Amino acid sequence: QSHVRISFDIPQYTMNVNLNGVLNLLEIIRKFCPKTKFYQASSSEMFGNCFDEDKCQRETTKMSPVSPYACSKLGAHTICANYRNAYNLFICCGILFNHESPRRGTNFVTNKVVKGAVEIKLGLAKELRLGNLNSMRDWGHAKDYVKAMCLMLNHDKCDDWVVSTMKTHSVKLQKPGKKIGKK
């Protein structure tokens, strides 16, 4: 379950999927195939509103989650570190910032905007409703993030790594109507 807002509606389900699911997999690896390399998709949401002095978030930045989703990801991240150290398992955690692809659901902002613009163009909708337009996000492409995941799993040593573009972008739309032929 990867939607922050929805995690407030279904916190127990979010924990079961994101934390207990990981714990179940780690137990199987520990008991039956300890040579397995495991990758955990952690989330920058684990940082909450904590930043280093230079306004960056890195592997050593304090983590202070502010949603059930972020708590579930921090729990999974922590149990991965515990299993890596206690059982000497090869477990890598990628602390991922936002990453997008055409496969991402329409309840996430980038595809929501595309879907809304198309619906307006086709006369199926008159407006597009969005949440906080002042939000700033570090957005990368899913293909680049998958490459980083592969590099982690092929590294000699397992560890935790932040995966980001190190650039933030506004959610504000810059004349989206022009792109679809609307004024």
Show which residues each predicted segment covers.
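Alpha-helical substrate-binding/gating segment
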Residues: 85, 99, 111-127, 139-162
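Glycine-rich, flexible loop/turn motifs
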Residues: 4, 53, 59, 65, ...
